[in-house]
Amino acid sequence: MDKITIPNEILIPEVGRLLAEGREVEMRPKGNSMLPFIRQEKDNVVLKKKDKVDKGDIVLVDLGGRYVLHRIIAEDGERLTLMGDGNVRGTESCTKDKVLGTVVKIVRPGGKSVTPSKGKLWKALLPVRRYLLAFYRRVWTKI
């Protein structure tokens, strides 16, 4: 089967529309910012619009035409702070109304589905995350 790549500026608004209608959407995210839990070119995510988002949720957000799929690491009223699991620093901020959907399932190759964790342990490992990610990228992915 041929692979079709649709630019985010076309795809994501349509995904947002489907999610707003109450539908679930399965898509394959691009980029390595959610390694090691969501792997580019291997994993798909299933998104759903939820009434309430919580710290630890992985969300798809619209940052003014730039779209990211990152984890909520802090919540202050209507304001959210996001960070990719594969990042060692650098965060994004947005308001809750910019959340298009929440990852409810990660689909691995072969069709096995896993429910995403809240990432509490991974957040606690932030001081050593750079070393864990280096090991993952240099060694684990080669196995």
Which stretches of residues belong to each language-model region?
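Extended hydrophobic leader/signal-anchor segments used for secretion and membrane insertion
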Residues: 1-143
